[in-house]
């Protein structure tokens, strides 16, 4: 019997088949005529996609029926649900920018013009010059190396 296959371009191919032929056989015949590999072909008849192992008789395809040929789509992942968070996002710490911050470490005497250090500089070799120690109420502390000097406690 003769069936028609309408391609994507609108071109109609005629194929000579038997009702006992499988969909695989039909796809092989389409490959011979059009050069499209069978694994990329999808045949549709009466709104249903035809499975490879079944025969034309299974789908009630009779003489002069028209099958529609479409190409297989590649890829496409599952759509994911949007995450819902229980806690709000933590606000990032904003760095406080202080202009001329080094002025708080030194004092200039108005009369003599002499510069004196207000903070103690860390003597540790790994810190290097210019690393000042933090003034706490009972100690000096270096934030870089962890060196601590505790003030003398008067009893």
From Swiss-Prot:
Give the source's domain of life in one word. Eukaryota
Short name of any one Pfam family annotated for the protein: ubiquitin
Database matches in SUPFAM superfamilies: Ubiquitin-like (SSF54236), Zn-binding ribosomal proteins (SSF57829)
The UniProt feature for the cross-link Glycyl lysine isopeptide (Gly-Lys) (interchain with K-? in acceptor proteins) gives its location as 76
Q: Domain Ubiquitin-like spans what residues?
A: 1-76
Database matches in CDD domains: Ubl_ubiquitin
The record's keywords, sorted A to Z, are:
Cytoplasm, Isopeptide bond, Metal-binding, Nucleus, Ribonucleoprotein, Ribosomal protein, Ubl conjugation, Zinc, Zinc-finger
User: What GO MF terms are annotated?
Assistant: mRNA binding; protein tag activity; structural constituent of ribosome; ubiquitin protein ligase binding; zinc ion binding
Q: Which Gene3D superfamilies does the record cross-reference, listed alphabetically?
A: 6.20.50.150, Phosphatidylinositol 3-kinase Catalytic Subunit, Chain A, domain 1
Gene Ontology CC: cytoplasm; nucleus; ribonucleoprotein complex; ribosome
What PROSITE patterns does its record include? UBIQUITIN_1 (PS00299), UBIQUITIN_2 (PS50053)
Read off the InterPro entries from this record. Answer: Ribosomal_eS31 (IPR002906), Ribosomal_eS31_euk-type_sf (IPR038582), Ribosomal_zn-bd (IPR011332), Ubiquitin-like_dom (IPR000626), Ubiquitin-like_domsf (IPR029071), Ubiquitin_CS (IPR019954), Ubiquitin_dom (IPR019956), Ubiquitin_ubiquitin-like (IPR050158)
TM regions (residue ranges)? none
ZnF bounds (C4-type) = 122-145
Covalent link Glycyl lysine isopeptide (Lys-Gly) (interchain with G-Cter in ubiquitin), residues: 48
Instruction: Please give the biological process terms from Gene Ontology that the record holds.
Output: modification-dependent protein catabolic process; protein ubiquitination; translation
Q: Of which family is this protein a member? A: In the N-terminal section; belongs to the ubiquitin family. In the C-terminal section; belongs to the eukaryotic ribosomal protein eS31 family.
* PANTHER family named among the record's database cross-references: UBIQUITIN (PTHR10666)
Q: What else is known?
A: Ubiquitin is generally synthesized as a polyubiquitin precursor with tandem head to tail repeats. Often, there are one to three additional amino acids after the last repeat, removed in the mature protein. Alternatively, ubiquitin extension protein is synthesized as a single copy of ubiquitin fused to a ribosomal protein (either eL40 or eS31) or to an ubiquitin-related protein (either RUB1 or RUB2). Following translation, extension protein is cleaved from ubiquitin.
Name of the protein in question: Ubiquitin-ribosomal protein eS31 fusion protein
Species the sequence originates in:
Zea mays (Maize)
Q: Which gene encodes it?
A: UBF9
């Amino acid at each position: 019997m003769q069936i028609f296959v309408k391609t994507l371009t609108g071109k109609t191919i005629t194929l000579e088949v038997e009702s006992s032929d499988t969909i695989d056989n039909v796809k092989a015949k389409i490959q011979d005529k059009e050069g499209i590999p069978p694994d990329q072909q999808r045949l549709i008849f009466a709104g249903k996609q035809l499975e490879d192992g079944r025969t034309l008789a299974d789908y009630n395809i009779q003489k002069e029926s028209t099958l529609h040929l479409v190409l297989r789509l590649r890829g496409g992942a599952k759509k994911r649900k949007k995450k819902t968070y229980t806690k709000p996002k933590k606000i990032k710490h904003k760095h406080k920018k202080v202009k001329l911050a080094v002025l708080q470490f030194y004092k200039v005497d108005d009369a003599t013009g002499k510069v004196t250090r207000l903070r103690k500089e860390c003597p540790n070799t790994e810190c290097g010059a210019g690393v000042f120690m933090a003034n706490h109420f009972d100690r000096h502390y270096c934030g870089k190396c962890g060196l601590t000097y505790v003030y003398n406690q008067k009893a």
